[in-house]
Amino acid sequence: MSFIMSSLRNLFLSPLRSFIQKDFHDAFDSMTLLDKLLFMMVHFVDKLILWHRLPVFLGLAYLAARRHLHQEYNLINVGRTPTGVRSNPEDYPYRTADGKYNDPFNEGAGSQFSFFGRNVMPVDQHDKLKKPDPMVVATKLLARKNFMDTGKQFNMIAASWIQFMIHDWIDHLEDTHQIELRAPEEVASECPLKSFKFYKSKKTPTGFYEIKTGYLNRRTSWWDGSAIYGSNTEALKKVRTFEDGKLKLSADGLLEQDENGNIISGDVRNPWAGLLALQALFIQEHNLVCDTLKKEYPKLEDEDLYRHARLVTSAVIAKVHTIDWTVELLKTDTLLAGMRANWYGLLGKKFKDTFGHVGGSSLGGFVGMKKPENHGVPYSLTEEFVSVYRMHQLLPDTLQLRNIDATPGPNKSLPLTNEIPMEDLIGGKGEENLSRIGYTKQMVSMGHQACGALELMNYPIWMRDLIPQDVDGNDRPDHIDLAALEIYRDRERSVARYNEFRRRMLQIPISKWEDLTDDEEAIKMLREVYGDDVEELDLLVGMSAEKKIKGFAISETAFFIFLIMASRRLEADKFFTSNYNEETYTKKGLEWVNTTESLKDVLDRHYPEMTGKWMNSNSAFSVWDSSPEPHNPIPIYFRVPQQ
């Protein structure tokens, strides 16, 4: 009987297989019948380059189908999974210092020094680490020629925010062995550094037969606010006051310093003034939550206040990222609806506020689900996730300081007073200059300045001669060329190059440079570096060159990693699902999260005059003197994207 069914299935699917591009035949053959049908739908839409032009409800259906396929075929575990060991969830109704015990079936999942997972299988590039030379790629294709910005869409607070998230999520453990890159003669005169030394990523045996070695994450992978709390007990002790649950913060609202002059915060490595400002803001948020909870529940002691406030503050950060930052990054009605559905479900905020979480993740959202969902793969962030978050082009060459004493002009615009080179805003210098500038002026200035665009030839030159720091925030002696290093890192960590990356993410690969971009100068330089071999194209270069979807500040290639991993950060975490309740957060704490909708709400709590006086835009992440978006009377699911 099974033979007959198999024959009938093959008879039905054979004609369909001929429609599918050959790149996907092996993947298609490995799929279940339902997944094959979903893939056919996705592939058909991809061939027509259509999904982002569909009415919103159809675009959401496409993204739901694609996300399902990625959840089935693009979540790959690295390392062993423990068997027969289970912790009691009731023993850990709080976020631990190192991220352990979130998953009762795998205590180490997402914790400090757990493995980075994979979205696609590793592609060994040991024999191609310098082909083409990373410094040639950086010089000819990445280095900034003329600054390109994002217009009014995305500002410097938005650029700072993503570094704030990176300091929460990811940092590879390094080896003790240094290696050196030297600039080839053809580009040496254009390279700020003729050579530079750096530490290799530390390879660690996994104890597993399929992927034998992997890389460890020095930060916790959970959305747990570790940028302000740290990723272990030692770091947490440094930031806590041990009074009323609070964290250390100076009287001027900026970060405190230790006896060595280093900042006191959860993660102190490689900061700049924008990151420091956000760390300080959310320490203020944590401390205000503590005050509020203490007033509401006088019997709560220091440890309980800290634990509840951390849960609340981490959830506020996750919510702001989900329904505010990402919505501005992917500025389309489809993604506005999609990101809000991640948090509130398709039934929407009003329904959820009234009736609670109803239905599964689609109708009710990931937040508040009855139990976490990891799709059978232990939670981690992935090597590919790290790669698509390489966004240093967002940073400009200078920060434009505004005169906050002047009377705001049209759209609350402010005159420019002076510009500070970005080199003076990183590390210890950045901390000193932030103190001189003052918090309000720093935030308002960042709010009024557009950030850089994620394009070819827009990587900051000043980042090609950069002083990196160690994990304690101390400057290292060897400067680095970060643009070249990022190319090397992807190859070193066996991340697939652009075309293979797309294939394995079920995206149609390019066959010629013209498929990637219409820019003739870019095509000329791509040929100069890679010849006509599109398979050699590095991932970062391809994502920078790729034609952008209207409204997207990132490439579609990067977005599909976002699609799966943004959902995963919420749905796999018990504190956003089964434990997202009054018992865990307290009634007042849960109310705090549920009534926070944006970064503007957070700013208004701590700097009540700031947004009212100087912000004209809808979001604190778009340029502040931009016009508010007009009301659209058409229900969002029935809107059609403007071409």
From Swiss-Prot:
Q: Does the keyword Cell membrane apply?
A: no
Q: Tell me if Cytoplasm is a UniProt keyword of this record.
A: no
Q: Which biological processes are named by the entry's GO terms? A: defense response; fatty acid biosynthetic process; oxylipin biosynthetic process; response to oxidative stress
Cofactor remark: Binds 1 heme b (iron(II)-protoporphyrin IX) group per subunit. Binds 1 calcium ion per subunit.
Q: Which GO terms describe its molecular function?
A: heme binding; metal ion binding; oxidoreductase activity, acting on single donors with incorporation of molecular oxygen, incorporation of two atoms of oxygen; peroxidase activity
Site feature Transition state stabilizer, where: 269
- Pfam families linked to this entry: An_peroxidase
Q: What induces it?
A: Induced by infection with the bacterial pathogen Xanthomonas campestris pv glycine 8ra.
Q: Return the SUPFAM superfamilies for the record.
A: Heme-dependent peroxidases
Function summary? Alpha-dioxygenase that catalyzes the primary oxygenation step of a variety of 14-20 carbon fatty acids, containing up to three unsaturated bonds, into their corresponding 2R-hydroperoxides. Involved in the production of oxylipins that function in cell signaling, wound healing, and protection from infection. The lipid-derived signaling pathway is involved in the initial response of hot pepper plants to pathogen infection.
The similarity comment for this entry is: Belongs to the peroxidase family.
Full protein name: Alpha-dioxygenase 1
Species of origin: Capsicum annuum (Capsicum pepper)
